[in-house]
Amino acid sequence: MVYKCAHCKQTVEVDKDMKGVRCQYCGHRILIKERPTAIKRVPAV
């Protein structure tokens, strides 16, 4: 999965096999999940 570091704004690749989640560039622990660029439309009820 691709995340963005909240501190240095670098794109970080995270695997499930990693022990803990940290930015590989600055060591910060807060990562933001990247959203897809496609817009998903849902019909109204």
Curated annotation (Swiss-Prot):
What Pfam family is a match for this entry? Zn_ribbon_RPAB4
A single Gene Ontology CC annotation of this entry is: cytoplasm
**Which biological process annotations from GO are given for this protein?**
DNA-templated transcription
The protein's enzyme class: transferase
Is Zinc included in the keywords of this UniProt record? yes
Q: Which UniProt keywords apply?
A: Cytoplasm, DNA-directed RNA polymerase, Metal-binding, Nucleotidyltransferase, Transcription, Transferase, Zinc
Q: Which InterPro entries match?
A: RNAP_P/RPABC4, RPABC4/Spt4, Rpo12
UniProt entry tagged with the keyword Transcription: yes
Instruction: List localization entries.
Output: Cytoplasm
Specify the domain of life of the species encoding this protein: Archaea
* Bound cofactor: record note: Binds 1 zinc ion.
Per its UniProt record, what SUPFAM superfamilies does this chain match? Answer: RNA polymerase subunits
Detail which positions bind Zn(2+): C8, C23, C26
Q: Which SMART domains match?
A: RPOLCX (SM00659)
Role, per record = DNA-dependent RNA polymerase (RNAP) catalyzes the transcription of DNA into RNA using the four ribonucleoside triphosphates as substrates.
Similarity-based family: Belongs to the archaeal Rpo12/eukaryotic RPC10 RNA polymerase subunit family.
Q: What is this protein called?
A: DNA-directed RNA polymerase subunit Rpo12
Organism of derivation:
Methanocella arvoryzae (strain DSM 22066 / NBRC 105507 / MRE50)
Gene name linked to the record:
rpo12
